[in-house]
Amino acid sequence: MEQKWWHNAVIYQVYPKSFKDSNDDGIGDLKGITSKLDYLEKLGITAIWLSPVYKSPMDDNGYDISDYEDIASIFGTMEDMEELIAEGHKRKIKIIMDLVVNHTSDEHAWFIEARENPDSPKRDFYIWRDEPNGIISAFSGSAWEFDDASGQYYLHNFSKKQPDLNWENEELRHQIYDMMNFWIDKGIGGFRMDVIDMIGKIPDQEIISNGPMLHPYLKEMNQATFGDKDLLTVGETWGATPEIAKQYSNPKNQELSMVFQFEHIGLQYQPGQPKWHYAKELDVPKLKEIFTKWQTELGEEEGWNSLFWNNHDLPRIVSTWGDDGNYRVKSAKALAILLHLMKGTPYIYQGEEIGMTNYPFKSLEDVEDIESINYAHEALEKGVPLEVIMDQIRHIGRDNARTPMQWNDEAEAGFTTGRPWLAVNPNYKEINVEAALADPDSIFYTYQALIALRKEHPWLVTADYELVDAADKVFAYKRVEGEQAYLVVVNLSSQEQDLPLVNGVEEVLIANTKVEQVLESGKLAPWDAFCVKLA
């Protein structure tokens, strides 16, 4: 395998609206991000994945784009963006842009023209039909919206203000590639591609994901834009299997660097149930099975894994699968150690490195997320009690990840001196960056150490993965390269568990516990986690 910079990189996702406000309007912005680059450099990350900062009406927090080559005024200016890229480069931190090309905003110039003039070439940039079929929007209800002006329906797989683009139109595709090259020329480090598996859809057959033209489009995109550049490209692919992931990320196919698979995230939901029916506890044996499949079936010559627990669409991992009460710090460290020592490129979501938690939403008035609000109204109409809906939003709602970054214990957690666009989690007095940096035993320093290990130890990129037999609630695996083996053991529970057999420890690489005591007792205390080099 030809090694690229992203094989031993660690990526940090910034949700700009909630990261750091520099002008006291209560909304995070580009200057705010630039002001915190020294903090991210201290953490040790290689690149920032920046959620969308393009011009947008903000119906879906920037994933509804009205101009791909301009910056939303709430985030700043193009000069601010160029400064962020330049200041990042000074610290060896690349900026990865969020590429949202399944849909635009209905306020994009293309859609405005398509709507106003049915004879315009831009009309075919979108998907219009005389009658709707059965496609359901990801945000509830029909995915078809009637347009009074032209008497046709347009497709929107998300909000009705996010009309889907028609990738069958060659002129549209080349306009998108021109836009990508505009950003590449600005010096960005790559693209995270939003719901990229949907661009090959066949609406008339109700095929939304993984359509037959998906991979030809990606090959064409690769050749027209980033293919000859040293950029990271990662696709969001909810339905991917290892075999599908190989199609995207096998270097021979000349498509993407890697994809985000969500099979492990599916364990947050009850089997066979829609998203809002969350699972009461983690099925650890199933988690072991899923990760082992991806670690062993997506070989390094055939593709590459993305490793993540959190993003802007998911609840906080320490609240979902950790224990955000008695064992918040220890369980956050355990989950980090488990993930970061696997094979692949790890992604950290802002606040994960200090153990930020879900928000205690009390009423629908606290909620900003369009997906949660739409679901709540639909569920109320079906007679679901409000207290059940609020419980679901507290566990699964996307706003859990979007509360402002907690920088210190001052008003509004140091995020803003204004009124924040979304309420700060009330636990910011205890959980914040300033406190984490002052505590040598904080979660932050575990993440910092894991990132340093990845930079120092080539085996983290190249060594094979082997699952180790252990108790149901214990996830243990080896990374093996030639005669050398490294053992990772994590107790994913708040109860004591039996330690799997460990033969001959040469060195402790990282731990959230006293490994010598664990080895002597043969017992793992709640949330014990460590990695050792075996003799």
What is each residue range found by the language model?
Residues 496-514:
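Beta-strand-rich binding/interaction modules
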Residues 56-57, 103-105, 198-203, 240-245, ...:
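Flexible loop/turn segments at secondary-structure boundaries
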Residues 2-177, 181, 185, 196-251, ...:
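Acidic/aromatic-lined carbohydrate-recognition and catalytic surfaces
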Residues 189, 292-313:
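Aromatic-lined glycan-binding groove of carbohydrate-active enzymes
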